[in-house]
Amino acid sequence: MSLHRSFRKGGTRLAAVAAAALLSGCLSDGDVATKDPSFYRSMAASGAQVDAATAASMISGYRKNNGLPPVTVDPELMKLAQAQAQGMASNDKLSHDIIRSFHDRLKGGGYRAYTAAENVGAGYHTLAEAFSGWRDSPPHRANMLLDGATRMGIAAAYSPKSKYKVFWALILAKPDDRKVANAM
């Protein structure tokens, strides 16, 4: 049986189902709002927050396609990423060192890591745009594919008067979970 014939055979059934779905929408007693996936939601609005679970899923999928393990959202890295994004937005400047150096921010935040990397960005209004920008930039792509990374934090900060409008920070890390010996 050819694909074409199979399509024609099921075409009548498909048309009937489509018509029924279309008519049921007309009979609905309320408006059906279609929501954009969260990775298309604009962060260029006061109070907008990145869907961290969606970001982790996108980055983990990308890592998986490159033979690497997934990353999970880390609350401490989320706080550090938020502080960085907000610092850049407040100063209207894209920089890794707007507050302090990346290493000093990790250390100052009490985050111990075997390895860590940070991507920053500005002007991307959606998670999809930020992800694509980082993926298409060799140094940023290398950070998303950081060997050994298992945790991540991501944030966006809105600055309405900035030409960029939205500032992003993404941190990936392999935490150092060893216990620190108490000094006596």
PLM regions and their residue ranges:
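Bacterial N-terminal signal peptides that target proteins for export
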Residues: 2-15
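Extracytoplasmic
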Residues: 50, 68, 76, 83, ...
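Disulfide-stabilized extracellular recognition modules
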Residues: 127-184
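Bacterial signal peptide processing site
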Residues: 27-30
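A short alpha-helix/helix-coil micro-patch that ends at or immediately precedes a cysteine
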Residues: 35-89
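C-terminal motif of bacterial Sec signal peptides marking the signal peptidase cleavage site
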Residues: 22-25
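Solvent-exposed, polar/charged alpha-helical surfaces in well-ordered, non-transmembrane soluble domains
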Residues: 53-61, 75-86, 104, 118, ...
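Short, surface-exposed glycine/acidic/tryptophan-bearing loops
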Residues: 78-125
